[in-house]
């Protein structure tokens, strides 16, 4: 009788495979979605922190990164005032336009290179008109080269340069072009401030805040941590995805085990007439469910690893498969299997042996 779960699994191979596949898809959904969100936030944090400037000043009410408004709302006149503050080495305006998960940066190349390590490694800088520079990751994922065009603002931009290292958005156009395209000349999205003495950056940030009390200041060294803690909307989204995955996986297991118990009604009646306890029968049903679920979880993790390499091979997106979340997915998968088998296990355990033996 100890082999009952395994014998049932191998007796109904197709149903076992389909159930495990359902669990696997649920696990892969959770792992890849969480990995995509965490990878996106991690990538954004480090690309924003790659700027050599120590302080980032945003418009009133604006957060950081993708919480920035897509409208250029901060006057570039603030740059002259910032440069006049003792301790400020330089201040550079950057326009940012967000579309989907992509960002187009508007920069003045000569000014931006003073506050970052960005350098053109192929072609030349985008200095005016409908010209664009892209980074190596975007170039590789889209198989682009110098002279190709990309669509931005509903018109083609000619790629004139490839830059390294990755910083901010993956596409950079002249700031004036971005301002004119958005009908916001004289405005920007954020200002990066280079500090003369990095050891005094906190004190300088305090003095800047006094002169610009309505603006939001962020230290670029803290951006990876800010992104790592996530954006509230993303965290809510992840909770919904995890919850739906557990529910769907539980329903898949419940349906399978309910069918199994119904098919084996006579066998259960025989076992009970031979003295099998209710706890033992319920335990056998749970064992079978957990074995099927475990196979599904392992398959789901394998799908997740393969999916990560496929996504990163063909897109500029990054997926972070953190060990803690892999263990979390394992626990969620087994939990969903256990919950899904509760009702079938209780139904099997509570069957009347006489009625079960007469079941056709």
List each language-model region with its residue ranges.
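Short helix-to-coil transition segments within interhelical loops
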Residues: 9, 261, 270-279, 351, ...
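Hydrophobic alpha-helical transmembrane segments of multi-pass inner-membrane transport and secretion
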Residues: 13-40, 232-267, 293-299
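Hydrophobic, regular-secondary-structure patches
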Residues: 28-103, 206-210, 214-216
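Peri-transmembrane interface segments
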Residues: 44, 206-251, 260-265, 270-271, ...
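A short beta-strand structural signal in non-transmembrane regions
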Residues: 55-56, 138-139, 160-165, 186-212, ...
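Hydrophobic secondary-structure segments that place a key small or acidic residue at a functional site
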Residues: 95, 102-108, 119-177, 187
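Transmembrane alpha-helical interface segments in multi-pass membrane proteins
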Residues: 245, 258, 266-312, 328, ...
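C-terminal membrane-exit region of the final transmembrane helix in multipass inner-membrane proteins
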Residues: 325-360
């Amino acid at each position: 009788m100890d082999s009952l779960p395994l014998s049932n699994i191998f007796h109904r191979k197709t149903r076992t495979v389909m159930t495990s596949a359902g669990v696997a898809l649920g696990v892969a959904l959770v792992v890849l979605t969480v990995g995509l969100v965490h990878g996106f936030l991690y990538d954004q944090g480090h690309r924003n922190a790659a700027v050599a400037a120590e302080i980032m000043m945003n418009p009133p009410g604006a957060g950081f990164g993708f919480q920035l408004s897509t409208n250029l709302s901060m006057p570039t006149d603030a740059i002259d005032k910032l440069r006049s503050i003792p301790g400020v080495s330089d201040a550079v305006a950057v326009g940012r336009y967000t579309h989907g998960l992509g960002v187009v940066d508007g920069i003045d190349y000569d000014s931006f290179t003073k506050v970052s390590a960005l350098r053109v490694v192929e072609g030349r800088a985008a200095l005016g008109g409908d010209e664009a520079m892209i980074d190596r990751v975007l170039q590789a994922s889209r198989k682009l080269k110098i002279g190709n065009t990309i669509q931005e603002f509903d018109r083609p931009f000619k790629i004139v340069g490839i830059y390294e290292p990755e910083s901010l958005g993956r596409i950079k156009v002249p700031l004036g072009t971005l301002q004119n395209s958005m009908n916001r000349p004289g405005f920007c999205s954020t200002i990066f401030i280079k500090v003369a003495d990095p050891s005094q950056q906190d004190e300088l940030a305090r003095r800047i805040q006094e002169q610009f009390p309505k603006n939001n200041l962020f230290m670029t060294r803290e951006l990876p941590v800010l992104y790592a803690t996530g954006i509230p909307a993303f965290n809510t989204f992840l909770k919904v995805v995890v919850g739906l995955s557990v529910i769907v996986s539980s329903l898949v297991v419940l349906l399978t085990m309910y069918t199994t118990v119904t098919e084996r009604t006579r066998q259960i009646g025989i076992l009970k007439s031979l003295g099998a306890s209710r706890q033992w029968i319920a335990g056998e049903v749970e064992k079978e469910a957990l074995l099927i679920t475990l196979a599904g979880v392992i398959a789901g993790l394998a799908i997740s690893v393969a999916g990560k390499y496929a996504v990163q091979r063909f897109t500029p997106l990054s997926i972070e498969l953190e060990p803690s979340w892999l263990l979390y997915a394992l626990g969620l998968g087994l939990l969903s299997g256990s919950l899904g088998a509760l009702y079938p296990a209780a139904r099997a355990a509570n069957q009347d042996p006489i009625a079960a033996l007469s079941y056709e």
